[in-house]
Amino acid sequence: SHVPLRELYLCAVQELSRHPELVEDVLKLQRWTEILNCPSDEEKESRRKQVRPLFRHFRRIDACLQPREAFRGSDEIFCRVYTPDHSYVTIRSRLSCRVGEILALVREKLQYSEDQPVLPGNLILVAVTSAGEKAVFRPSDEAVFTTLGVNTHLFTCEPSELETLLPLPEEIHWTPGDSKLHDMSAEEVANQLVVFDWELFSCVHEVEFVCYVFHGEQSRWRPLNLELVLQRCSEVQHWVATEILQCQSLPKRVQLLRKFIKIAALCKQQQDLLSFLAVVLGLDNPAVNRLRLTWEGLPGKFRKQFQQFESIADPSRNHKSYRDLITSLRPPLIPFTPLLLKDLTFLHESCKTFHGELVNFEKMVSQSDLTCLLFLSHLVAMDTETSPSHLQTKAYVRQLQVIDNQNLLFDMSCKLEPKDT
């Protein structure tokens, strides 16, 4: 059996950070593993039915290193559903599953749980953010998994217990310390950000944009892959703020600022405007922006460069600077997806789809022109090959640990540099 060889490969990947001299051996192991694991047609069909992880829910290092594939509503995933005491059950469900079906699966699990001696009555499904905000789903809601925020979790409880739901402890507490990012080069991190963005973005079909804009939340067919791209944008923004605010050393914070500005520049150079603007907006987070001593330690060259980046992110005059940049670039490129959706939504809501019984073709052409950029981007293949020497960075970039509670981020900021400093 070739299973032990794969296990050896995974162990070697985990040891790369401590033993970089293993790079060539890991490369050979990877090649042999790929050869031995080359699937037959029957195996390929079977893999389509396997349970697949969302990118924020990786549990094993080999899962996060696999290339991303487009999600369909029929795909199955594992998901944790928590109870008010923070115990949880793990369910296996289709992505398009209705909330009523999810609750039925949860009830079945709780029935055999030792932690639940009494079977609960009427259950509801709730999304709880790290800030404690709650959103109750309707039994008819579908495909709720991809709508969750970065650190949002699913809870189930009886209606009378709704107000008792609290975020998980790990979402409201933080531990200061040095980041793994200090040991990684800006080039490696930027390259892996771009690679992952391309994998996610290439999974999005143009129809998902049309569905998102024309149907919104009322659509029975959710734009699953597009929602994951939007989540990734939010995740990268909060990652930047989290890394800087967890760093207790002033000189190291300055180093992180320099590194993030360099990462943004490299993403822009590779025409990944999604991560480029996400990093810039992360540095513009009020909790980071107020760190006067940290920003004063930044060399003038980097401050000037960041000011140029800020001007591109400036929303004034209908994002003119960003639009000028887009016009100057040639595909393939990854646009800043939230702004693209904003443009499509504005065009849809400001123009009627029909004039009497006639279709407004002018509106359709304008919508087509906006989505044409996506089509061209998908047509051109990107050279995104990576070597095993970057596997640790690759795993890190695909499993970002972030704090998305703005109040907590601001408290961390004030502890680093109190208001009177």
Predicted regions and their residues:
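Core of folded catalytic or high-affinity ligand/protein-binding domains
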Residues: 1-7, 209-335
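Intrinsically disordered, proline- and charge-rich regulatory regions
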Residues: 2-72, 104, 295-421
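Intrinsically disordered, Pro/Ser/Thr-rich cytosolic linker and juxtamembrane tail regions that serve as
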Residues: 3-228, 234, 239-246
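A generic secondary-structure boundary signal that marks alpha-helix termini
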Residues: 17, 111-112, 269, 289, ...
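Detector for Asparagine
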Residues: 37, 122, 151, 191, ...
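A broadly conserved detector of short glycine/acidic/proline-rich loop/turn motifs that flank catalytic sites
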Residues: 129, 280, 350
